[in-house]
Design a protein with these regions (language model features):
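N-terminal accessory/assembly segment that mediates macromolecular interactions
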Residues: 63-67, 74-117
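Well-ordered alpha-helical segments within folded domains of soluble proteins
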Residues: 48-71, 109-127, 167-183, 224-242
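N-terminal Sec-pathway targeting helices
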Residues: 1-11
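Eukaryote-skewed repeat-based solenoidal scaffolds used as protein-protein interaction platforms
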Residues: 94-95, 105-205
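Long, well-ordered core segments of solenoidal/helical folds
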Residues: 30-48, 67-92, 135-155, 190-214, ...
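Terminal, non-catalytic domain-edge segments
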Residues: 14, 19, 23-66, 185, ...
Length: 264
C-alpha cells in the first residue's frame, strides 16, 4: 500500500507510514537496496533473502535496521521463535521495535496487518508444500487475529499496544480482504465468518468515515486523509466490493473516485 509523501504530525500518521511505505519502493535483486521516495529509509535484503527496513534516524527515532513483518514474504521467517509469540492457542506477530514519534508505542506492539500477512504467507506455503507445520502455524496466527486482542466485534485493530489501540480504516479494509484469501487457501469457515463480520462493520461505518474530499484515518476521526492518498484506498475498497458485491461499498467507491477527480 502506498501513501503520498507528507509530513507526519500525528501518531496516526506515523502508524500509517509504517504500514504503507513498502509499496512505494521497488524490489532489487540479491543484496541490493530497494529504492524509496523517502530519502531517509532503505529496504534491504538480508542473507536469507528476507526484507529488512532501515529506518536510520527517521524523525530522530534511531530505529535502524529492523524486520517489519508487514514486508516479509518468507514463511520460515515467521516460524522463527523470535518472530511470533505463543499465547496458548494463538500466536501474535509482534513489531519488535519502539515507535516514539508523537506517541509512546514500545515494543512489542501488534496489528491486524502483521497477523494477516503471516497468516497468508504460511497458508500459501502449506498449499505449495503440503507440510502440515505451515498450516498449523497459519491457523494459530488466524486464532490471534480472531482473538479479543485484535478482533473487537469485527473491527480488526490496526494498532495494539500497551498504551494505545487504534481502529484504522485502511487496515480494516486490508485485513478483511485478506481473510477471504485465507479462506480460499484453507477452507476455514471461521475465516469466512470473520470476513462477513468485518464487511458488516465497514458497511456500518464507512459513510461516517468518508468526509468531504477525504476519509478519516480511524474511528477517532482526528485526522482526515487527503484524496491524494485515495488511489490505494480505492484499490482496497474495490477489492472488497468485487469480493462481496455490496451496494454500500460500491456507492462509497464511486464517491471516493468522484472526490479524487474533483477535489485535487
Amino acid at each position: 500500500m502506498s501513501i503520498s509523501n507528507l509530513i507526519l504530525v500525528l501518531i496516526g500518521i506515523a502508524i500509517a507510514f509504517l504500514f504503507t511505505a513498502a509499496a512505494e519502493s521497488t524490489t532489487a535483486n540479491n543484496n541490493e537496496e530497494k529504492e524509496t521516495q523517502w530519502s531517509d529509509i532503505e529496504y534491504l535484503i538480508d542473507a536469507n533473502n528476507d526484507t529488512m527496513v532501515n529506518y536510520k534516524n527517521l524523525f530522530g527515532l534511531n530505529i535502524g535496521k529492523v524486520y517489519n513483518p508487514n514486508f516479509v514474504d518468507d514463511a520460515d521467517w515467521f516460524l522463527g521463535s523470535s518472530n511470533y509469540e505463543d499465547h496458548i492457542g494463538y500466536y501474535l506477530i509482534p513489531y519488535n521495535y519502539n515507535w516514539h514519534f508523537y506517541s509512546n508505542i514500545s515494543a512489542p506492539w501488534y496489528g491486524c496487518e502483521a497477523q494477516s500477512k503471516a497468516m497468508l504467507v504460511t497458508a500459501k506455503k502449506y498449499n505449495e508444500t503440503g507440510d502440515p507445520k505451515y498450516l498449523e502455524f497459519s491457523k494459530k496466527v488466524f486464532n490471534g487475529l480472531n482473538s479479543s486482542v485484535i478482533n473487537h466485534d469485527g473491527w480488526l485493530l490496526g494498532l495494539v499496544s500497551k498504551n494505545k489501540n487504534a481502529t484504522i480504516l485502511n487496515s480494516q479494509m486490508f485485513c478483511v480482504a485478506n481473510l477471504m484469501t485465507y479462506y480460499e487457501y484453507t477452507g476455514d469457515e471461521r475465516a469466512l465468518t470473520l470476513f462477513k463480520k468485518g464487511v458488516d462493520v465497514l458497511e456500518k461505518n464507512i459513510n461516517d468515515l468518508s468526509g468531504n474530499c477525504g476519509t478519516y484515518y480511524s474511528l477517532s476521526k482526528n485526522r482526515l486523509v487527503s484524496v491524494k492518498q485515495h488511489p490505494e484506498y480505492m484499490k482496497m475498497l474495490e477489492r472488497l466490493y468485487l469480493m462481496t458485491g455490496s451496494e454500500m461499498l460500491k456507492n462509497t467507491l464511486y464517491k471516493w473516485q468522484h472526490d479524487y477527480l474533483t477535489c485535487r
